[in-house]
Amino acid sequence: MKTRLTSFFLAAVLFAVASPARAQVQWDKVFNKLKLEVRADGEYTKADSALHPNLGFHGKYFNFMLGGDLGGGFSYYFKQRIVAEPGTVTFFDNTDFLYLDYMPTQNWRVRFGKDAMALGGFEYDASPIDVYFPTNLWRNIYCFQLAASGAYITDDGNHTFVAQVSNSPYVNYNGLNYDAGLVAYNLYWSGNIGHLHTLWSTSMVEYSWDHYLNMTMLGVKLVYDKWDWYVDFMHHALAFDDWGKNFGFVSCANYYFTPQFNIFVKGMYEQNKSDVTLGSSVSMDHQLAAGHTTARYGLGFEWFPSRDKNVRLHIYGCRMTDSFTDVDGAAKTIGSWNFNIGATWTMDFYKLFKK
């Protein structure tokens, strides 16, 4: 008990010194918002060992977003996935965001409610509807949690520091209730230094009572008029002797021929050479089951037919491999190809009503 009280005390102290910005980890000022956004894809996946591919059309995302100013420095934001798997823990499972934000000054903000865990990296920071062939960590981490956060924003707006205490995602993985007592402590820095942008975080994520997984996620991005390029590094460790065994990289570069048309290339590598897997589910270790190494790489393009960018068309193709040792001790590699074509569109009702 003393250990847990100490952890909460440290989190309270750190609450004053750290926060994120942009997209997923959002600390920009909330403006009036009333939107529906939709993404539908046609997908073709063929495993090397399969006789026939899996293919078809499906709805990827259908999101409702509502946000605005409540006065007196208070604002709110709500985002619900209308099409989603039924929740297994609470009604809030399919709610990405539902928080109250208070901004007493231009530099300080506090927030409470359903929010994204304050984790670094540009792939993680992007809204899910904008992510193509993601990493295993992105696929598996249960990142939307009830949380309390505090942020400090510099006068020029270029740096945001956040400290956050949230429910641990292992509450969801283990099928527990919110009062199971598992928590996560997250520290985050978002920085803009000329053309260089950063999204860095370090976290202690409780996976069982008083047992923690350390997560370090570091993202750097170069941004210019015609192109941008980011590299994210993700690292997990259960103990000091576990460092360097469970990590991954993901990198993506965009070239913008016009403001409405860009091509991108993306690649990633992830490995888990830890001695143990947390639980029976692959998702328990966020990235991979122990003993697995995966690589994924591909390219594609995006086209916005209109300048307001309310409609987006995309096409991409990628290759994935998974290397591991089977139960007989033999080294194996399995691979697959994935091709995807889709459309995303946004219905901005607030802008329509203003007109």
Residue ranges of each PLM-predicted region?
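Bacterial N-terminal signal peptides that target proteins for export
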Residues: 1-9
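Bacterial N-terminal signal peptides
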Residues: 9-17
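Beta-barrel outer-membrane channel/assembly domains of diderm bacteria
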Residues: 21-110, 150-155, 161, 254, ...
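Surface-exposed coil loops of outer-membrane beta-barrel proteins
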Residues: 23, 41-50, 87, 91, ...
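Outer-membrane beta-barrel pore domains
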Residues: 41-43, 47-52, 88, 123, ...
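Short Gly/Pro-enriched turn/cap motifs at secondary-structure boundaries
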Residues: 54-55, 137-141, 289-290
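Exposed loop/turn and edge beta-strand positions of beta-sandwich/beta-sheet ligand-binding modules
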Residues: 60, 94, 106, 144, ...
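A generic beta-sheet turn/junction motif
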Residues: 71, 154-156, 191-195, 222-226
